Amino acid sequence: MKILSVFFLALFFIIFNKESLAEKTNKGTGSGVSSKKKNKKGSGEPLIDVHDLISDMIKKEEELVEVNKRKSKYKLATSVLAGLLGVVSTVLLGGVGLVLYNTEKGRHPFKIGSSDPADNANPDADSESNGEPNADPQVTAQDVTPEQPQGDDNNLVSGPEH
C-alpha cells in the first residue's frame, strides 16, 4: 500500500510540474495572450472543424437508418413466429380437448364423430351409396310392441339397472 501511494504521489508531482512549466513558458513569451485566443482573433478559421462534425453526423444517421432496417426485419420475423406459435398452440389445445372428451366418453382418444356403433354401421347408408332405391320395410306389430317378460310377473324390470 505504501509503495502504491508513493507511486501516485510521484505521478501527481510529474503532472503538476508539466502544467507549471507550460504556464511559465506562456508567460515567458511576453505577450501574455494564450495561443487559443490568438487563433480566435488572428485567423478566420474556427477552432472546431464543422465539416468533420457534419460528416460524423451523416455517418451516425446512416448507421441509425441501418439499425432501424434491421429492427424492422426482426420485428416482422417475431410477428410471424408469434402468429405461428398461436396457431400451433390452438391446434394443440384442440387436440388435448378432443383426447380428454373422448377418454371421458370411453372412446378412442383421436376418434372424431359419433360414438354409437349403430350409427356407424347404418345399412340404409350402404344401400344409398350403392345407388339402389331405399325400400321401406313394412313395420310389423312385433317390431312396435315390447316383449313381455316370461315367467315371474312380479319382476317387471329386468336388466343391469338393478
UniProtKB/Swiss-Prot annotation:
Keywords: Malaria, Signal. Residues 114-130 have a biased composition (Low complexity). Pfam families: CRA (PF06589). Residues 24-44, 109-162 are annotated as: Disordered. It comes from the Eukaryota. The keyword RNA-binding does not apply. Residues 1-16 form the signal peptide. Residues 137-162 have a biased composition (Polar residues). The keyword Signal applies. Although there are no authentic repeats in this antigen, there are a number of internal homologies (N-A-N-P) and (N-A-D-P), the first of these tetramers is the dominant repeat found in the CSP of P.falciparum and reacts with antibodies against CRA. It is possible that immune responses to CRA may act against the CSP also. The CRA is found in many parasitic strains. This is Circumsporozoite protein-related antigen. It comes from Plasmodium falciparum.
